């Protein structure tokens, strides 16, 4: 019973981490006040204003996170016990897509 509670706890922590990661990463990756202004004197003046995309790079962050957790969690599970090692890949196959879908739906619901 204790191993199943541990598995459930780890799964909940994993899913919550993925669901709340877009909010944290968007704040870290893009500064909303970033602007680039340039002037050219060849034929006149030209201004260039750049805008930061708050969702830039999130796919690669989630990919790296999934790969790292995919390597680390089964190794830890094998040390905890063979029952957990059998159940964990099934949980990860279901939890990761579910968490990604939840994150996408959360991004769509946020006002821009």
Curated annotation (Swiss-Prot):
Expressed by the venom gland. Residues 27-56 form a propeptide. Pfam families: Pilosulin. GO terms for biological process: defense response to fungus; defense response to Gram-negative bacterium; defense response to Gram-positive bacterium; hemolysis in another organism; symbiont-mediated cytolysis of host cell. It is found in: Secreted. It comes from the Eukaryota. Residues 93-106 are annotated as: IgE-binding determinant. The keyword Secreted applies. Residues 57-78 are annotated as: Critical for cytotoxic activity. GO terms for cellular component: extracellular space. Residues 1-26 form the signal peptide. Keywords: Allergen, Antibiotic, Antimicrobial, Cytolysis, Fungicide, Hemolysis, Secreted, Signal. Belongs to the formicidae venom precursor-01 superfamily. Ant pilosulin family. Has strong cytotoxic and hemolytic activities. Is more potent against mononuclear leukocytes than against granulocytes. The synthesized peptide 57-76 shows a potent and broad spectrum antimicrobial activity against both Gram-positive and Gram-negative bacteria, and also against the fungus C.albicans. Adopts an alpha-helical structure. This is M-myrmeciitoxin-Mp1. It comes from Myrmecia pilosula (Jack jumper ant). The lineage of its organism: Eukaryota, Metazoa, Ecdysozoa, Arthropoda, Hexapoda.
């Amino acid at each position: 019973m204790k191993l199943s509670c541990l598995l459930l706890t780890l799964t909940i922590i994993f899913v919550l981490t993925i669901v709340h990661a877009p909010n944290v990463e968007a704040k870290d990756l893009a500064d909303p006040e970033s602007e680039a202004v340039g002037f050219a004197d060849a034929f006149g003046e030209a201004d260039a204003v750049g805008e930061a995309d708050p969702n830039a790079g999130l796919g690669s962050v989630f990919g790296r996170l999934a790969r790292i957790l995919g390597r680390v969690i089964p190794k830890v599970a094998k040390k905890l016990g063979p029952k957990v090692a059998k159940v964990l890949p099934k949980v990860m196959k279901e939890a990761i897509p579910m968490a990604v879908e939840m994150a996408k739906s959360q991004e769509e619901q946020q006002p821009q």
